[in-house]
Each structure stands twice: as C-alpha cells, then as structure tokens.
UniProtKB/Swiss-Prot annotation:
CDD domains: STKc_CAMK. Induction: By the mycorrhizal fungus G.intraradices colonization in roots. Ca(2+) 4 binds at residues 486, 488, 490, 492, 497. GO terms for cellular component: cytoplasm; membrane; nucleus. The lineage of its organism: Eukaryota, Viridiplantae, Streptophyta, Embryophyta, Tracheophyta. Belongs to the protein kinase superfamily. Ser/Thr protein kinase family. CDPK subfamily. Residues 59-319 form the Protein kinase domain. Ca(2+) 1 binds at residues 375, 377, 379, 381, 386. Keywords: ATP-binding, Calcium, Kinase, Lipoprotein, Membrane, Metal-binding, Myristate, Nucleotide-binding, Repeat, Serine/threonine-protein kinase, Transferase. This is Calcium-dependent protein kinase 4. One of its GO terms (biological process) is intracellular signal transduction. It is found in: Membrane. Residues 29-43 have a biased composition (Basic and acidic residues). It is a lipid-anchor.
C-alpha cells in the first residue's frame, strides 16, 4: 500500500522492522533462531542498555510472526502467568552506529510513555542479553488494518465503520502529541486489530520512526511511507500536523478504496502530494456524505498551520458520530495557545477577545469540547485547580505553579478568578485555520471585531476610542498599547493593521529534529 523510505536511522515496528509483516508458521521450542554473527556478536556484546537480562527464564518463545531489517517478532508465553505476548527481538550486531542504539532506547522510552492507552499496543518490559534486545508487548492476532481494507468489497469501508477506525487512529495521534511525540509513519500496515472480531479495537504498533517534539523546532529529515507522507515532510519542515495528514490519506482510502495521490514512481507520488488535490468527483464520492468529504478535505489541507489538529478532528461531526465528548483528549495546541496568550501585548489580547465574541456556536464545536474536557466539575467555568491539572500533563515544557496562575489571570478578563468559555476561546483560537480555510468569512470576522473598537466607524482605532471601550479597564497612557499594531506609525490602527496583528497570533508548538525534549521551567 506504500513504499517505506527514510533518511532517519530507526528500529522499525512491532513487526521486527520496517516493511510488510510476513505471516509465518513454525514453533521454535523456546529458543530464538540464531542470527549468526561471529565478530559482530563480540562487538555487539559491548552494547549495554541497562535492561533486565532474564528473558529466557521469563518467556517461552513460540511461532514467528514477522521479520524486518533489524530483527524478528515472535509470539511467546509468560512462564509464570501463561499470558501470551509478542516479542520483538532486535539484533545488537546490526547496531553498528551509535544512532541505532539511541533509536532502540528512544523506541522503548516512547512505548513506556504511551503505556495504558486503549489504542496503543501495551508495553510490558524490555530485556537484553549479549546479542539481542527483546521488547515484550501485547499480542495482537486480528491482522493489519491494511488486510481488512483489502478484504472488503471494492476495498471500501462503510462510512460508519470507517469513522470507528479513524476515531481510534486520531486518538493515538492526539495522545502522542499530548506527550510531546510525533508518530511520523501513520499507515494501515502499522495498525493491528487486537482480535479477529469485527468490533475488535485497533492498536498502533510501530513507533520506530517516532520522535519527540521540542517547542520552536521542526523536523528536517524525510521519513515515512510515500503514499502517506505530508507535503511539509517533503519540504523538510514538519511537525505533529504530518500525522493528521497521514490519517486523512487513510480515511480517503477507507471510503473509496483508492489512494488520493498515486504515480508509478516515488518521485511521481511526491509531485502529486505537493501539487495536486485529491479527487472527490469520481465514484463512489458522489454517493458519500458531505460530512465525510468535509472531514477528509480538512485533514488533507496542504498548509499544516491550517490543518485540523488530531483533537480538533475528533470533534468533527462525521467522526464523532456515536462518540462521546468525554472521549476527546485535551489538545496540545490548546494548551500551547493558552501558554502563548500570556506573552501577547494587552492590545493583541483585547483584539482576540473581540474576535472570539463574533464567532458562532457551530464554529466553536471543537473548542467547546476542549473547554468541557478541562472543566472537570462541569460548572461552566475553569478554576485554577482545573487549569493546573490540565497543564500538569506530560508536556514538552514544565510549568511552575506561579505560571499557571499567571495564565489564568491573563485569560480571565473579568477578574473573577475563573475562565468562562468566551475567555477560553479568545486564548485558544486557531487563527491560521480560520484565515486559511475561509478567507471571506475571516474578513467578515475581522471587520466585526474591528468595529468593536472603531466607535465612530471611520476605519481607524484611535487612542481615545480604545480608552472609551470600558471593558478594557485601561488607565494611564494608551498610545504605547497601539505601537505594536501601528505599522505606519500614524498613531492609529487601520483594519489592515488590525488583521495583521491577529494573524501573528498562532500556535508555537513545533517539533525538534531529534531526541526527547528538555523540560523548560517557565
């Protein structure tokens, strides 16, 4: 379903390596096949990970499940409990470069970070001996998502069934992003069903190309699988948004049985991804609901800043059908935007509040879900404790206690010690999505927000008008507040300058080239 390429050295998947899993029969009677090695084995013996070294005593090895570039994956049985597991064995002799060792360590760290999520393969433990590393995980026997797609009539899912599958993939992406991770290789081959039942949960199994996010950075390498790669990956400036693009490609395939971008060569596929739009005219698209088409289009927006986040996508009416608001995780971009809001000038904060007040309920569905996720006691407002709980998650930054209070105070425009929904919206708007997805509506919203300050309707905001807007509660000199937006330095703000000010408000959460983030005390 798609060639795998990478300029990033990595252990590949829970299948023992990158590429298609190969189903094999055979019992190895408790011993793993010898990979050979000679001098390489002696060299490998010097690589130490610090993992437990009693794998053979703990597990009875069974049939081979698959293999790849770096090793094999086997079924195994826990000798003490009788539980069946999957074991990924990675050959130390093939870790000839330090980066390969770091990749194994990172993959184990990632599996530990994501442990416990219902749609991510469960990690039990990591072991090693002189020759191999063993990663013990949940055994999934329902086959790949790819195989189920191919088994469907015309290789298509019904909309209802597709939404169930896509919802699970989005939950994985949202969980990764909340933990400061980007998956980087979302494709049907990397999702397994727990069992052969039709309603079996889907499990993400391959984190070999995954990497950590560091705020303010981007990935500059090209990794992933050709059919699912996002445009920004090919431009070597990618982040968590690339996972959402890949899920958009998978959704397109689930609904129509075809790839949205196809060519005979890898370079040709890349050209299609960069230049062309998916086709929604050929059958079966005319018979597919407008909601499904709207959903796919919003995931396949070429500009990553205008693309839905994974958590936003979970709030879309099509994929949410049958799902509950409580199932929607907190969006990393919402927390990042709140953190950024504190750094804005007072006038920019005022402008965002004015913009928020112009938006209609249907435009705010995803932010309402986010507000409800943080408002644990369902009081209709977010308290300091609820905000502290939301911001205490395992983020790519670390907030000290006083900073949480500072965020609350910046967002809380009426100074009642709580954050209501309108205040929350002002601090968490995805400005670039609004501006890019519907430029006409964006223009009308900016005009409406501008009019709240332009009291005499002459097309400019003056210091006197800003002073007269009572809800700002300003004292002292007003002129300094306008300086940031007053590009032509004429002492007043035009509509064009106002719109540019709003456009500078954007999410600052971007990923790093390599390695886990160093928490940044603020």
């Amino acid at each position: 379903m798609g060639a795998c390429f990478s300029s990033h050295t990595a252990t590949a998947a829970a299948d023992g390596g990158s590429g298609k899993r190969q189903q094999r029969k055979g019992d190895h009677k408790g011993k793993l096949p010898d990979g050979g090695g000679g001098e390489k084995e002696k060299e490998a013996a010097r690589v130490e990970f610090g993992y437990e070294r009693d794998f053979e005593g703990r597990y009875q090895v069974g049939r081979l499940l698959g293999h790849g570039q770096f090793g094999y994956t086997f079924a195994a049985t826990d000798r003490a409990s009788g539980d069946r597991v999957a074991v990924k064995r990675i050959d130390k002799a093939k870790m000839v470069r330090p980066v390969a060792v770091e990749d194994v360590k990172r993959e184990v760290k990632i599996l530990k970070e994501l442990k416990g999520h219902e749609n991510i393969v469960h990690f039990y433990n990591a072991f090693e001996d002189d020759s191999y590393v063993y990663i013990v995980m949940e055994l999934c026997e329902g086959g790949e998502l790819l195989d189920r797609i191919l088994a469907k009539k015309n290789s298509r899912y019904s909309e209802k069934d597709a939404a169930v599958v896509v919802r699970q993939m989005l939950k994985v992406a949202a969980e990764c992003h909340l933990h400061g991770l980007v998956h980087r290789d979302m494709k049907p081959e990397n999702f397994l069903f727990k069992s052969t039942k039709e309603d079996s949960p889907l499990k993400a199994t391959d984190f070999g190309l995954s990497d950590f996010i560091k705020p303010g950075k981007k990935f500059h390498d090209i990794v992933g699988s050709a059919y699912y790669v996002a445009p920004e990956v090919l431009k070597r400036r990618s982040g968590p948004e690339s996972d959402v693009w890949s899920i958009g490609v998978i959704t397109y395939i689930l609904l129509c049985g075809r790839r949205p971008f196809w060519n005979k060569t890898e370079d040709g596929i890349f050209r299609e991804v960069l230049r062309n739009k998916p086709d929604f005219r050929k059958k079966p698209w005319p018979g597919i609901s407008s909601g499904a088409k709207d959903f796919v289009k919003k995931l396949l927006v070429k500009n990553p800043r205008a693309r839905l986040t994974a958590a936003q996508a979970l709030s879309h009416p099509w994929v949410r059908e049958g799902g509950e608001a409580s199932e929607i995780p907190v969006d990393i971009s919402v927390l990042s935007n709140m953190r950024q809001f504190v750094k804005y000038s007072r006038f920019k904060q005022f402008a965002l509040r004015a913009l928020a007040s112009t938006l209609k309920e249907e435009e705010l569905a995803d932010l309402k879900d986010q507000f409800d996720a943080i408002d644990v006691d369902k009081s209709g407002s977010i308290s300091i404790e609820e905000m502290r709980h939301a911001l205490a998650k395992d983020l790519p930054w670390r907030l000290k206690g006083p900073r949480v209070l500072e965020i609350i105070q910046a967002i809380d425009s009426n100074t009642d010690g709580l954050v209501d929904f309108e205040e929350f919206v002002a601090a968490t708007l995805h400005i670039h999505q609004m501006a890019e997805l519907d430029s006409e509506r964006w223009g009308l919203r900016c005009q409406a927000a501008f009019s709240k300050f332009d009291l005499d309707g002459d097309g400019y905001i003056t210091p006197d008008e800003l002073r007269m807007v009572q809800h700002t509660g300003l004292k002292g000199s007003i002129e300094p507040l306008l300086e940031e937006a007053d590009i032509d330095k004429d002492g007043r703000i035009s509509l064009s300058e106002f719109r540019k000010l709003l456009r500078t408000a954007s999410m600052s959460n971007l990923p790093s080239p390599r390695g886990p983030p160093n928490p940044q005390p603020l």
